Regions:
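Conserved class I S-adenosyl-L-methionine
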Residues: 2-50, 64
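Class I SAM-dependent methyltransferase SAM/SAH-binding core
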Residues: 56-58, 64-114
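Short amphipathic alpha-helix with an adjacent loop that forms part of the alpha/beta core around
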Residues: 113-121
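Short catalytic micro-motifs in class I SAM-dependent methyltransferases
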Residues: 131-132
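A short glycine-rich, Lys/Arg-flanked "PGG" loop and its adjoining helix->strand segment in the class I
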Residues: 142-154
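C-terminal alpha-helical "lid/dimerization" subdomain adjacent to the S-adenosyl-L-methionine
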Residues: 161-225
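Core SAM-dependent methyltransferase catalytic element
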Residues: 230-250
Length: 250
């Protein structure tokens, strides 16, 4: 796990097409409970009961979360933000058939300037993020959550599907084993022929591992509460995979 004292940003690896292709083709489909995480996101958004007219997807990757939101709210205007051009290219392809067409924004969540790039589309009824914010130092995570809160409409919902820190190395090892088992099952289903040992070696030595700055979900929920979010909770958690968030008070 990377610490905040590191001087060199490690998440720049996600700007490379090779890593993006490897993740989208060989990893993302093997994430445990991925469908359930998206279902939880949609249920929480629906429970707010307010019209969903504008949505933002931060660290959007290939747009999988936006695709799910627009399937439920087809008239919504979507804004997708990522600093990785290969990810944005994949998102454009995934969402090419959407009307109204989404806006794709190349911006870095590590710096507050991203807010200026989306401010004209605010306020947002829903802001989501999936497996992106854990690349930021904790101080920046907290600041980003405040920026998100300021961009939400009254009653608007923020949902973060995220890789979070375990409380001990023992729990982390269980989480890693579960992830490796899930990836192995995914590749076996595709007929890839990789052994569990090969999958484990690739997972342990993956090039993006150093980019992770994980924080406990409990701490992140506390940050949201301190920033004024309401109804903050962890809605789903299996080992290091969590869905959490809160609402801007109406």
């Amino acid at each position: 796990m990377r610490t905040e004292t590191d001087m060199v940003r490690q998440d720049e690896v996600w700007k490379g097409a090779a890593l993006v292709d490897r993740f989208l083709d060989g990893v993302r489909g093997g994430i445990p409970f991925a469908a359930e995480q998206i279902d939880v996101m949609l249920r929480v958004v629906a429970a707010c009961g307010a019209p969903v007219r504008r949505v933002a997807d931060l660290g959007c990757g290939d747009g999988i979360l936006t695709r799910a939101l627009l399937a439920a709210y087809p008239a919504a205007a979507a804004t997708l933000v990522d600093f990785s051009e290969p990810m944005l290219t994949a998102a454009r392809a995934r969402l090419a058939d959407r009307v109204p067409p989404p806006r794709f924004v190349a911006a870095d969540l590590a710096h507050s300037v991203w807010v200026e790039a989306v401010a004209d589309r605010a306020p947002f009824d829903v802001v989501v993020s999936g497996y992106a914010i854990h690349h930021l130092p904790d101080a920046r995570k907290r600041t980003l959550y405040g920026e998100i809160g300021a961009l939400l409409a009254p009653g608007g919902m923020f949902v973060n599907i995220e890789h979070v820190a375990s409380r001990s190395g023992w729990i982390e090892a269980i989480s890693d084993a579960a992830m490796i088992d899930s990836l192995h099952a995914f590749h076996t289903t595709r007929g890839a022929g990789k052994s569990r040992e090969q999958i484990a070696d690739e997972y342990v030595h993956r090039p993006d591992k150093a980019a992770n700055i994980l924080a406990p979900v409990e701490a992140q929920c506390d940050w949201l509460r301190a920033l004024g979010f309401a109804d903050v909770d962890c809605f789903f958690k299996v080992f290091e995979l969590a869905v959490f968030g809160g609402r801007r008070p109406a």
